[in-house]
């Protein structure tokens, strides 16, 4: 009887607090200066805003014209650059993020190459 009551209480708690409330969201971001060809990144921040701020600050250590170009949540981001442009994309895994960024860069530039790729830690 006590076990049944405990199970019912546990089910009630789980119903009141959806699984999303227990999931940890981790954010990453890239900032880039197309003029100066410098980038900054941030990974595993608790909010999008914090990740973007950190990426911009990281980029601004080496360049003056940095802008936030990509953010991602519980995923991977890739920055691909070429002489005339860049591509920045995200996906659930590194391979797909890189492939998407390569394709985006190829529409703007020749000789695109992977500049950076990072993935957030797996959510707990």
Label every PLM stretch briefly.
Residues 2-9, 21-124:
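Helix-coil modules at protein/domain termini and other flexible surface or pore-lining loops
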């Amino acid at each position: 009887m006590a076990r049944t009551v405990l199970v019912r209480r546990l089910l009630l708690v789980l119903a009141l607090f959806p699984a999303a409330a227990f999931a940890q969201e981790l954010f990453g971001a890239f900032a880039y200066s197309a003029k100066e060809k410098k980038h900054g990144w941030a990974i595993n921040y608790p909010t999008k805003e914090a990740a973007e701020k950190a990426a911009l600050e990281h980029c601004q250590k080496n360049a003056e014209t940095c802008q936030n170009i990509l953010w991602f949540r519980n995923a991977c981001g890739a920055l691909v650059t070429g002489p005339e442009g860049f591509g920045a994309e995200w996906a659930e895994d590194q391979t797909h993020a890189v492939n998407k960024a390569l394709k985006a860069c190829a529409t703007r530039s020749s000789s695109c190459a992977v500049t950076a790729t990072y993935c957030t830690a797996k959510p707990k």
